[in-house]
UniProtKB/Swiss-Prot annotation:
Its main location: cytoplasm. Pathway: Protein modification; protein ubiquitination. The modification Phosphoserine is found at residues 4, 13, 21, 24, 46, 810, 816, 820, 835. The modification N-acetylserine is found at residue 2. Keywords: Acetylation, ATP-binding, Cytoplasm, Ligase, Mitochondrion, Nucleotide-binding, Nucleus, Phosphoprotein, Repeat, Ubl conjugation, Ubl conjugation pathway. InterPro entries: E1_4HB, E1_FCCH, E1_FCCH_sf, ThiF/MoeB/HesA, ThiF_NAD_FAD-bd, Ub-activating_enz_E1_C, Ub-E1_IAD_1, UBA_E1_C_sf. It comes from Bos taurus (Bovine). This is Ubiquitin-like modifier-activating enzyme 1. Residues 1-31 are annotated as: Disordered. It comes from the Eukaryota. ISGylated. The modification N6-succinyllysine is found at residue 528.
Amino acid sequence: MSSSPLSKKRRVSGPDPKPGSNCSPAHSVLSEVPSVPANGMAKNVSDADIDEGLYSRQLYVLGHEAMKRLQTSSVLVSGLRGLGVEIAKNIILGGVKAVTLHDQGTAQWADLSSQFYLREEDIGKNRAEVSQPRLAELNSYVPVSAYTGPLVEDFLSDFQVVVLTNSPLEDQLRVGEFCHSHGIKLVVADTRGLFGQLFCDFGEEMILTDSNGEQPLSAMVSMVTKDNPGVVTCLDEARHGFESGDFVSFSEVQGMIELNGSQPMEIKVLGPYTFSICDTSNFSDYIRGGIVSQVKVPKKISFKSLPASLAEPDFVMTDFAKYSRPAQLHIGFQALHHFCAQHGRSPRPHNEEDAAELVTIAQAVNARSLPAVQQGSLDEDLIRKLAYVAAGDLAPINAFIGGLAAQEVMKACSGKFMPIMQWLYFDALECLPEDKEALTEDKCLPRQNRYDGQVAVFGSDLQERLGKQKYFLVGAGAIGCELLKNFAMIGLGCAEDGEIVVTDMDTIEKSNLNRQFLFRPWDVTKLKSDTAAAAVRQMNPHIRVTSHQNRVGPDTERIYDDDFFQNLDGVTNALDNVDARMYMDRRCVYYRKPLLESGTLGTKGNVQVVIPFLTESYSSSQDPPEKSIPICTLKNFPNAIEHTLQWARDEFEGLFKQPAENVNQYLTDPKFVERTLRLAGTQPLEVLEAVQRSLVLQRPQTWADCVTWACHHWHTQYSNNIRQLLHNFPPDQLTSSGAPFWSGPKRCPHPLTFDVSNPLHLDYVIAAANLFAQTYGLTGSQDRAAVATLLQSVQVPEFTPKSGVKIHVSDQELQSANASVDDSRLEELKATLPSPEKLPGFKMYPIDFEKDDDTNFHMDFIVAASNLRAENYDIPPADRHKSKLIAGKIIPAIATTTAAVVGLVCLELYKVVQGHRQLNSYKNGFLNLALPFFGFSEPLAAPRHQYYNQEWTLWDRFEVQGLQPNGEEMTLKQFLDYFKTEHKLEITMLSQGVSMLYSFFMPAAKLKERLDQPMTEIVSRVSKRKLGRHVRALVLELCCNDESGEDVEVPYVRYTIR
């Protein structure tokens, strides 16, 4: 997904402000953050029993409290075919207390279609016993055991959650009744070919602590009326985002102090900036200020038992285009259970006799259903299709339903997120051939091989086609691992002339293990692509997978060249950034290859399918850009912890990376100063002053010098600069209109006084001094006592605020000031910088920020720097966990969402491989497992454009053969003439990449020179780059006029040169 972590700030009540101003008392609110010494630093650790290194990304989805509840829950998973193993995998990765695997059956050939922890040599062995050691490897914190006896009541009593998969209805009803009456939460999951079913019963009194998982919202108050009800108006900088029925609390309100610290109150939204609260008519008059924060109030929800809900079901929709289908499938699945009980088997694949019988049974089930459930008209065609595919077992369907079911288990354990209430049905009938006559019973008969479960649905022809596919998988992270697993199960690229190429340049880290399930602890530091490829070969030894370690981009186009792409059947993205996604999208459009795109963000996920000449591309629509924080807010007027964390990240770069890089360039590049002077605004001054500081004014010789520097810098940032700001804008300052300057989003700061006994102050000095020492190659220290002793001898110069110092209140002011340059100061700097010749062999060591290493002082510095600044402005601080999320721009992630999303991707893959050509056969998908919400839509058709009577889309282009029959290349003049005669288009501008090759306003002399030059020669000269031997064609962009002189939009040109 293209979005970044949703990290809206929640405010908590702070100290009452002084009457008549927005200034808060000069004391700290940091006592709310626990400090636990670890690794020599005071770190905020929420719970020592949670391995934050392993569960890092999942903790940002669930939170510590939900995670703790998860760790006290034992879960039974009954049925270890493809669906059961998917659910077990996800909840083991999630970190429940213990998992017991139950199955009394033995592995059959058809199980290998989706059960990725069964091998061919396991045929005939108990599924639970074979799977147990392989599942146990996923998470050393979760004991996994196997049980092969009957599901008796004494055994069931040991579990908090019971999951039944692929079980008879008789067993479901018996177990369901027992679980409901004994407070055991129940999940029933079933998949039949292209159909899936899910049922949840979490008891009559489940406490839901958080229904959506979103960070609580907060907003700044600008007005509260004395009324019944009182109306709250928020600052118009941003919409408040609340909904009617939300509960809120208030803090920092001046005047109407009765609101501060009051019990959470329910609101009614009146508009994007207003809402009503309780009766405020007897409260004090509102003066100014205040923060309103959403409060998540626990609520009780009640479930019916399985027998009761079977008779009177409630449905969660998965596809609003199939509105009546859940009720029809509710009848169909009951009929299927009756059929299986009568015959001891599922209906035979695509057998008309069994399909007719299932329709008859379904009619009988419908007839005896309660009136509210009874279907006036049974969809017999749907029931027949259920019969046709019910014997099938598809890995993608299991991945989707298994991801959902595992998330429901986590909801049952933790009380976090809204459960499915209570039935969910899903189908993917669009995956069947568009030619309804293509499948016959003969084609779907079992072959006694690992793909029998899939052949039962799609026949043997598609299986052969899947094996011959050549696919490029870009990324081997969480989505990449799940894709490879599904590819292995469905047989993609498993025939002699098939292949999957997977590329990923990353190595495995501990935090990956929680959701990138192909990796194990002993794989940490190994290459992802190699390890993932080896792991899926264990799942299906026939898969032909080649691993690369290349980043996709212009620099690897000699590897992923024309030959490479032309041999592909399609591309699947498993990327984590928008730039790489857009690059691969452009390559797929150029080479006209299908692209399967997906992404996740916590419990949210999306799938997009891109089909040549049919759909729009990934880049056709984009998310709006993220709202950036104004520079002046960061520098002088922060009001949220996000502001102080971004400021701390900027500090890190400006202290420990950029100066060192600039010094090294100054010492090695003779043109560095000349190049720096050409930078815009005040940048030349800032860069050269930083170089002078690093080489002359602040260059340390010893560790003690680094401690002194850190102490001085502490005073500059948290005392001196704040005192200067308050000198310029005193607490009682008024604006030109007479309003208090320190009001609204401007929080009045106060300076801090350094105290070596304050853990946070010492944290800052130790982290800053160690990082500063690293940039000079000096050895640091973690000895807190020794550093405290050194600090006692540091002399801090007395600071007196200066008059005439300009502090900019807005970014517009700042930009105006940056336009003027102090040339005399620049000349002085150039003269005083030491000559590189005088510093032979000297170099500095820039530090790249790395958030996941708790021993490198990076996050120690960020947390201390941010929370000290937050203390300056009386902003509630953030613990290390939250700080890492925001400063590290971490994308929350959980295995359940990934599994479900990839299941949907591979359903689209079935359609792509079959060559579906109807737009309504494909489905773009969006889901949010927390709500739960599912939305599917047809992909948008590629937008159509026109010049003259010629229609075109992004998939069309002009094909121009650069080499002429006589072996000579086309010149610019010939190129321009070709378009005039062949297409009646007059080219007004012509470019290749960022290079302008021709324009109507080009100087006559330059134009005359170029007209007779070959096109490739012009490209090389203008771009100052030689064309590589792998380049067979150039992409040229045109601006054109038609014969009437009107500007017309036209496709690009593919200009072939070899």
